[in-house]
Amino acid sequence: MTAISEALSGITDHQKAHVLAEALPWLQQFRDKVVVVKYGGNAMVDDALKTAFAADMAFLRTVGIQPVVVHGGGPQINAMLGKLGMTGEFKGGFRVTTPEVMDVVRMVLFGQVGRELVGLINAHGPYAVGISGEDAHLFTATKRTVMVEGKPTDIGLVGDVTTVNPEAVLDLIRAGRIPVVSTIAPDSDGVVHNINADTAAAALAEAIGAEKLVVLTDVEGLYTNWPDRDSLATEIDVDALAQLLPSLDAGMVPKMEACLRAVRGGVPTAHVIDGRVAHSVLLELFTGEGIGTMVTPGPTSPTEGVAS
């Protein structure tokens, strides 16, 4: 089954024609543009969602859009730690990474999660190539701390991306490939750090001049007053988001920080979407209403832009 057939499976031929016709303005708008997609959450553990996501990436490449995938691997890392009798701990939304945990993170991200995703995409053609933040000096990291109950807290070998050397990724894009990036990176002394995938995706999107950053999550989008489900925001600008960040649930903070960084760094829009919905990336890019929450540089008017 081709990527296009996979993406349009389950609907009639008439509906397929309507969907493709409706998508035309967005196909034109995003042709030859780079879209960075952070792959994570339930989308990377459910087999049907994994297959749908891979088809979406191949679809984008087929219609002339240039996807770059940046992936985490939280569920798989947790599973491997459990098999090895090791415990996992989170503080401030980030994994506490000891040297022993770092060995597992490195093995799982590049050797398991990345390889599986490359294989799923390449079922549609020889498109995807795996790369890690260590390769060709793609990322350089510095150790970070997080605020827990108002205090800076050490979380081990966890880093922030401080420099990006995007040439290896740009070379792959120019060759018609889909880069699949594992988020591990050395510091200036060569010590490898675990990089939050949301953080890495934002830094890469900024460095390569992406048109969009799309972050997959396990919720419908950003709730400004969780758990009030009526507080789901379809759009928020960077100033409003910056004010809201301190009050967000710890798990959402890295995702929204990533969107904030990307848009402030020149990416036109960033999006948090529900990765539990099959083909959610296509719904965001190619439908008028989009899906999830869009982060913008400033308030937008209803007539601004063609797509969300």
Swiss-Prot record:
EC number in record: 2.7.2.8
Site, as annotated: Transition state stabilizer: K38, K255
Gene3D superfamilies on file: Acetylglutamate kinase-like
Residues involved in substrate binding: G73, G74, R95, N194
Keyword ATP-binding: yes
InterPro entries registered for this protein in UniProt: AceGlu_kinase-like_sf (IPR036393), AcgluKinase_fam (IPR004662), ArgB (IPR037528), Asp/Glu/Uridylate_kinase (IPR001048), Glu/AcGlu_kinase (IPR001057), NAGK-C (IPR041727)
Organism the protein comes from: Rhodococcus jostii (strain RHA1)
Entry function: Catalyzes the ATP-dependent phosphorylation of N-acetyl-L-glutamate.
Keyword rRNA-binding: no
Enzyme class: transferase
Protein name stated in the entry: Acetylglutamate kinase
Homology family: Belongs to the acetylglutamate kinase family. ArgB subfamily.
Location (main, coarse): cytoplasm
Catalytic reaction annotation: N-acetyl-L-glutamate + ATP = N-acetyl-L-glutamyl 5-phosphate + ADP
Domain of life where this protein originates: Bacteria
GO MF, one annotated term: ATP binding
Compartments it resides in: Cytoplasm
Pathway(s) this gene product operates in, as recorded in its UniProt entry: Amino-acid biosynthesis; L-arginine biosynthesis; N(2)-acetyl-L-ornithine from L-glutamate: step 2/4
Coiled-coil parts of chain: none
Gene Ontology terms: cellular component: cytoplasm
GO BP, sorted A to Z: arginine biosynthetic process via ornithine; L-arginine biosynthetic process
PANTHER family to which the protein is assigned, alphabetical: N-ACETYLGLUTAMATE SYNTHASE (PTHR23342), N-ACETYLGLUTAMATE SYNTHASE, MITOCHONDRIAL (PTHR23342:SF0)
Keyword field: Amino-acid biosynthesis, Arginine biosynthesis, ATP-binding, Cytoplasm, Kinase, Nucleotide-binding, Transferase
